[in-house]
Structure formats: structure tokens, C-alpha cells
Amino acid sequence: MCGELGIPVLIHSADPFQFWLPKDDQNERWFELKEKPNRFYGDSDFIPPFEEIIKEQHTVFERHKNTTFINAHLGWMGNDLKRLGEHLDEFPNVVTEFGAVIAELGRQPKTARQFFIDYQDRIMFGKDSYNKEEFYTYFRVLESDDEYFNYFRKRHAFWKMYGLNLPDEVLKKVYYKNALRLFPSIPKELFE
């Protein structure tokens, strides 16, 4: 139905794959799991394994080729941009956004910069919640060439981040042009 009507579908499946891994020193989200133990799904009888959830999501993309999907949070592939690129190549009806996973991009600036250039028509700005102070970190990662700065939330990232220094045209697409293409009823003059 959405495909027939030209309505994009935002789809959020699973959570970070680390929430299914053992809570030990090899899990980069261990501190978040310590703070919020209800986010650990590794021993759940109710929540399916991560890969099963993602496979089901990809089956939906395959079955509904005429529907545009916005795969939230880089499809939880921010740690593997090569895999995410292959995913976008496989599913031309999928775009993505990077709400809550900017840290994964800021720790691999060269790879992330090239990924954004290569897939500039398939990436949209995303944010899980409105907190004005957090936007500065997003803008700093995307727009600057700053080095070795902190992420705003310690439970997500114990590494420093670096700016991607994206070209202006890529930034415009990520910030608003891609959204205007997907949602043509948004007044374009808001962005001129």
C-alpha cells in the first residue's frame, strides 16, 4: 500500500548487535548494558537473535521492491560500512539515516567520508531525540576536520571521534535534499 501511494516507510528493526553479545570486556557496549541491563537480549526466550530479526527485515525489503524504506540507524551496520554499502546496492529501494550512531562514523573518518560521498543520495540526517547540545557533535563530525574529540554520551563510545569534512553538496543532500526528494510535500522554501 505505501509503495502504491509513494509513502516512504521508516523501519527500525532490532537494536545494536552488541546487545546480544556477552557482557564482557570484548563488548564495546558493556557499560550501556551495565547501566541499562534490560537492553541485554543474549539470553532472552522472547526476543529472537539479532541476525534473525535483520534477515526478516531484509525479506520485507525484497518483497516490497516498490516501497521506499528508511532503514534506521544505518541498519545497525555503522561498524561495517562495506557491508552497509553492499546492503544499499542490493536494495535500491532502501535509504538510511544515522540517528544515535554518529559515534560509529566519527571513529572511522576516512572510510565514513568516502561512504557518504559514494552513497550521498541514500543517506538522511537522523536523530533519535531532540537535545540541542547533541546536534553540535553531529555537525562537528559531518562538517569539520577536527580531530580527537569526545562523543556526548559515554555509555555509547569510549573512543575519540574525528570530523569527516564532507563536501557542501553532500551535506545539503544529507541535511535536507534527500528528505525533500522522499517527502515532496515539505515546502522547499524552508531550505532556501
Where do the language-model regions lie?
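H/E-rich (His + Asp/Glu) clusters that bind or coordinate divalent metals
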Residues: 45, 51-59, 64, 68-192
